[in-house]
Amino acid sequence: MGLEEKLPGGVLLASVEKLANWSRRSSLWPATFGLACCAIEMMSTGAGRYDLSRFGMEVFRASPRQADLMIVAGRVSQKMAPVLRQIYDQMPEPKWVLSMGVCASSGGMFNNYAIVQGVDHIVPVDMYLPGCPPRPEMLMDAIIKLHEKILAGPISGRIEHTKIGSSPYPKPIEVATARAGLPEGAFDTRTLSVNDRKRFSIPAGAPAPTGGGAVEPALDTRRPAALAPPSVFGRAKRIPVDPKPSDEARAHGPGPTTESIGDVDGPDRGI
């Protein structure tokens, strides 16, 4: 009827949350962080043929303090896990993680002691991208889906305050260590392979032994040092053993007073 008020041209109504998330989505700067073969496909995605600058991502920052997206491109070795976590901690919040390739997501073909069986044991992951390796088109599709997730998320983003080894996944080795009466920290849970986790696992709901109870059969109290994995930094370490073993350990035979564990590259170097 001509009585309605009309907004003048050039005025846009939006919430502060939508505006902040739109800005984050449109200027998502990845960190320069390549680990293995998937990094080649990530570099191809940033080249002129696919041109990530269309999505505001042409700048791969060399400093984690200027990046807000970590693309874990390739398998993560046990020695690289602390470095990866340190880079993640240096990134400003809010920040996001994209696990590129099956090796980064679940270990892939590297089902052994040297490779982390899933990067989500080290850092929280927002988007998983399968493939070996995934093509640049697949990486772009995963990035677009991550953009949609950022746009629909809260203004505070996903803020995490965790440390290495504080993954939400259960750590049965810690439970088994406590039940075996070994000192806290005798096992480094960061260096356990998937086979070791299965070896030391305890059935859910199993009652904890009381004083004088039997030790879990999955652990051998005669040689606790032999069960300890090597250091994550590759150095040999020594774990002292009580020279006066318990009655249960004595029934299995005498054990050594000190054992040496070699590094992952070879025999004990006496470090």
Swiss-Prot record:
Pfam families: Oxidored_q6. Its cofactor is [4Fe-4S] cluster. Binds 1 [4Fe-4S] cluster. It is a peripheral membrane protein. Disulfide bonds: none annotated. It is an enzyme of class 7 (translocase). Residues 239-251 have a biased composition (Basic and acidic residues). Keywords: 4Fe-4S, Cell membrane, Iron, Iron-sulfur, Membrane, Metal-binding, NAD, Quinone, Translocase, Transport. Its EC number is 7.1.1.-. [4Fe-4S] cluster binds at residues 37-38, 103, 132. It catalyses: a quinone + NADH + 5 H(+)(in) = a quinol + NAD(+) + 4 H(+)(out). The keyword Methyltransferase does not apply. This is NADH-quinone oxidoreductase subunit B. It comes from Frankia casuarinae (strain DSM 45818 / CECT 9043 / HFP020203 / CcI3).
